[in-house]
Amino acid sequence: VPYNSIISRDASNDPLVPTPVSAQIIQEMPASSVMLQRALQRRLSSKTQRQPVLDVLPTAYFVSGDTGLKQSGTQDWKNVELVVEELAVIVPIPEAYLDDAQVPIWDEVRPRIVEAFGNKIDAACLFGTDKPSTWGAPIYQSAVAAGNVVTAGADLSKNVAELGELLAKDGFPVNGFASRPGLNWKLVGLRTTDGQAIYQPDLQGRPGGTLYGYPLNEVSNGSWDATEAELIAGDWSKAIIGLRQDISFKMFTEGVITDGSNAVVLNLMQQDAVALRAVMRIAYATANPVTRLNASASTRYPFGVLRAASYTYS
């Protein structure tokens, strides 16, 4: 676990203290989080909150004759628990380094912190990477366990349609896709049997496009595991992101940073440094409500996976 990372005058950071020849930093726009874009968001008022999800559907009955008895039915719910966990980072920078830089360093650091948070959130929710134990099961593993998986073949347009059919049989609509970076270029030339394009890029030059009429987000923040999946399709209203606190930034000019053994690795006052701390409090869970088409929670799930052709079965 890194506790002593610091922005300093090493070779990797020298471009931030520019020579007189060049004083401009060219950097790409930070990649966003597909979970924060697509999932249903709930504002939470406490660390733990329960979300009711339909678990038992009522049944109607025909009444026999004029005086037949009407039968009773039941409807029930179960709780999906959202547990807030903290996502945080501290970025220390020596004051002398800040003084010599000819660009606003913190303006460059802040968007990259936001991007790093998006990476962690997507990796945890989609593939379970570094996922807190209190969070719900990741989307990829849950979809595979439910049998909602198609392996990518020569005809991706057919594969995506097959995936949509699996979800429809479970009683869930597809209202969006998330994919590996670069998949849009593979899709752009695909046509239906009558010559219609199945993928439409955004003509305004913005990221994303539509696949079979539904939005497609390429996950370009480094969290996507391309060895596992090409694409995830699903009903994104069933993925729930609970927000207890948006990303907050706080600057420190005094204090110490310690490691896991409580040893001081940086004393801000003594070593003339400042530190930016970013904190976010967030929860994740997936709702898997009962449907008329599939009453079994073990074989029903609101997401499906187009598995990578190179996937190796264990």
Regions from the language model: what does each represent?
Residues 2-89:
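Assembly/oligomerization interface modules of large self-assembling protein complexes
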Residues 101, 186-189, 286:
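Extracytoplasmic/secreted cell-surface and envelope-processing proteins
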Residues 51, 113, 276:
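A residue-level signal for conserved active-site and pocket-lining positions in enzyme catalytic cores
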